[in-house]
Each structure stands twice: as C-alpha cells, then as structure tokens.
A protein has these predicted regions:
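Short amphipathic alpha-helix in the helical subdomain of ABC transporter nucleotide-binding domains
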Residues: 81-85, 131, 159
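Hydrophobic alpha-helical segments typical of transmembrane helices
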Residues: 54-57, 66-69, 130, 162, ...
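Conserved Rossmann-like nucleotide-cofactor binding loop
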Residues: 29, 36, 128, 191, ...
C-alpha cells in the first residue's frame, strides 16, 4: 500500500498530482483489442499452414511480443516466427488494428489524470506506429505527453525497456524527497507489473484485461482494479486496494 507522509500532504494535493506520472499499457488496459489481434494471428498461421491453437492458448498471444509467442506456442524457430509475424502485420496493419474498442469509462479516466496535471504516458509492446494509429482512431492522442511502443530498429522489444524509455521521456522523478513513489504503471499482464516493480513504479494490475488475477498476484501487483472506476478510486486515494 502506498503511504503519503503528512509533510507531503501539507504541500498540497495539487502539488502532489503535478509531480506524478501515470503510464498506461494499451491492449487489455485502455482498449479491448482481442478480436483484431487474434483474427490476425489466425490469418498468419493459416497462411503458413499451421494448426490453429485452442482459444485459451491464443489468448496468451495478448501481451508479449508476438515473435516470442509464435516460438513459444507454435514451436517455430526465430526466422520462421519473424516470417509469420510479417504476415500477421499484413492483416493487422490494415484491418485488425481497428477491430478494437475502448473499455468503458476510459475517457473519464484520461480526463481525470489530465485535469489533475499528471504526466500521462503510453508504454506498449505493440509497434509504436500501430499504437499511434489506434490512439488517433479513438481521438485520445491528445491525452498523452509521451508515447512509446516497440521499435525493433532501436532495440525496443520488451516491456521493461519500453517502460524505462517512457519514464525517461516523461522527465519526472520516481520518488519525492520523502521517498514516496510518484510513477504509476497500469497494465493487465505480468509483464506490465513486473517491469513496473523492477523500475520502482507503483504497479496497478487491471483484472478486466487479458491477464488473470492469479497472474497479477504472482507478479506482485501492488493494487488490483476490477474496472476503470477502481483505477480512479485508487488514484484518488479514496479506496486503497490492499496488496493481495
């Protein structure tokens, strides 16, 4: 549970908020992108004659880099996985990225954090070009001060390094002079929580996305939120979610 010292409170709630950063994952946190991703994964696998895994296995493709998922769940070598990923992009880059929808009350959440002067960032393992197109599609790009996605040419592939870059670009401290942490990482998979914890963030795991409550607990999420309203309550400190 995050504690805020009385000295910190005395400086005023507005100042606290102005020093804070919130970093969101995209898939499974801001948007429900299951349809577009899984249809595009299926398209890619069928194009190369692979058997389609059961749905519960396909769900594991939501979150980590897809090249890794093709190797892990379909037994591909790296070179083959990269070819299949390219085929995935043929469909996802034109159709699949828009087979997607915002979760309920996301706009209200983004309004809140902008109005309360958080620095707002996106950190996603999705290629950054897709992430920006999706934010534009939903007319929410203006809420974000920083957007960082995967960029293979720059060596940005895994969540920890993507999150690290987002934190650096935000330019705010991780803690105040009392040691209270100032950066939230909000995501639905263990990769979000583990990366946030390793980098000194306050980790908020959302159970409405693609990771299970067990997965988020095992990753040591500091807070668990069952819906977007729970995120709002957590940020308001009106309802402190106990570490489970």
């Amino acid at each position: 549970m995050c504690c805020i010292s009385m000295a910190y409170i005395k400086r005023g709630f507005k100042e606290i908020i102005m020093n804070k950063t919130i970093i969101f994952d995209l898939d499974g946190t801001l948007t429900d992108s299951e349809e577009g991703i899984l249809k595009s994964v299926t398209y890619a696998l069928e194009s190369f004659g692979y058997e389609i895994p059961p749905h519960e296995t396909l769900l594991l493709f939501l979150g980590p880099p897809l090249v890794d998922s093709f190797q892990e769940h379909c037994g591909m070598a790296l070179e083959e996985a990269e070819k299949v990923y390219k085929k995935f992009g043929e469909r996802y880059g034109t159709i699949g990225k828009f087979e997607n929808q915002l979760y309920p009350n996301i706009i209200d959440l983004l309004d809140k954090v902008k109005n309360e002067h958080y620095t707002v960032a996106l950190a996603t393992a999705k290629p950054e070009v897709y992430a920006r197109e999706i934010l534009d599609h939903f007319s929410i790009t203006q809420y974000f001060d920083v957007i960082v996605g995967a960029n293979y040419k720059e060596g940005l592939v895994y969540k920890k390094e993507i999150l690290q870059k987002a934190i650096e670009l935000c330019g705010n401290p991780l803690t105040d002079d009392t040691g209270c942490r100032l950066v939230y990482m909000v995501g639905d998979r263990k990769y979000d929580v583990e990366s946030g914890n390793e980098l000194g963030c306050i980790s908020i795991g959302v159970t409405y996305g693609y990771g299970t409550e067990t997965e988020l607990n095992d990753a040591n999420a500091e807070y668990l939120c069952d819906d977007v309203d729970d995120i709002v309550m957590t940020l308001d400190l009106e309802e402190m979610l106990v570490r489970r």
